[in-house]
Amino acid sequence: MLPTRLLSFSGSRAISTSFCLRAHGSVVKSEDYALPSYVDRRDYPLPDVAHVKQLSAGQKALKEKEKAPWGSLTRDEKVELYRIQFNESFAEMNRGTNEWKTVVGTALFFIGFTALILIWEKHYVYGPIPHTFDKEWVAMQTKRMLDMKVSPIQGFSAKWDYNKNEWRK
């Protein structure tokens, strides 16, 4: 009885303490969704903020050089200024992806897997085809139905010519 009480007292306290320690393990940084954010979209070509928010010393010097006439900037500096403002160009945004290969491959995988399951079922689950599906059996059954004159007004036997022993045209 005493060990049970000690275990229950220390066990519940240890469990609750470990939960508290686990809960305070990391600090979650919350995003302020009221502030504008950067996004590359074709239908929204000029985002509210620049792509690079924290400029390095070289980028700050380049931004100062940007205030001068643009003819003095080299092509590489113009590209660097563009990359500070935007992550992708329109050509890069419009470039096709290879996602279709993944979709087609996944679809073909599942079609193949389904085919394997059907082949396995046909081989191991289903029995042999009943003898009533044989062409000879179907012919005998049709002859029997014609001999019995099944549905003679508008049905099966109405389409059979009993004098010529052939189907009516």
Swiss-Prot record:
The modification N6-acetyllysine is found at residues 29, 53, 60, 67. Pfam families: COX4 (PF02936). The modification N6-succinyllysine is found at residues 29, 60. Residues 1-22 form a transit peptide. Gene3D superfamilies: Cytochrome c oxidase subunit IV. It is a single-pass membrane protein. The modification Phosphoserine is found at residue 56. SUPFAM superfamilies: Mitochondrial cytochrome c oxidase subunit IV (SSF81406). Pathway: Energy metabolism; oxidative phosphorylation. Residues 23-98 are mitochondrial matrix. The chain crosses the membrane at residues 99-124. Keywords: Acetylation, Membrane, Mitochondrion, Mitochondrion inner membrane, Phosphoprotein, Transit peptide, Transmembrane, Transmembrane helix. It is found in: Mitochondrion inner membrane. GO terms for cellular component: mitochondrial inner membrane; respiratory chain complex IV. One of its GO terms (biological process) is mitochondrial electron transport, cytochrome c to oxygen. Residues 125-169 are mitochondrial intermembrane. Component of the cytochrome c oxidase (complex IV, CIV), a multisubunit enzyme composed of 14 subunits. The complex is composed of a catalytic core of 3 subunits MT-CO1, MT-CO2 and MT-CO3, encoded in the mitochondrial DNA, and 11 supernumerary subunits COX4I, COX5A, COX5B, COX6A, COX6B, COX6C, COX7A, COX7B, COX7C, COX8 and NDUFA4, which are encoded in the nuclear genome. Belongs to the cytochrome c oxidase IV family. Component of the cytochrome c oxidase, the last enzyme in the mitochondrial electron transport chain which drives oxidative phosphorylation. The respiratory chain contains 3 multisubunit complexes succinate dehydrogenase (complex II, CII), ubiquinol-cytochrome c oxidoreductase (cytochrome b-c1 complex, complex III, CIII) and cytochrome c oxidase (complex IV, CIV), that cooperate to transfer electrons derived from NADH and succinate to molecular oxygen, creating an electrochemical gradient over the inner membrane that drives transmembrane transport and the ATP synthase. This is Cytochrome c oxidase subunit 4 isoform 1, mitochondrial.
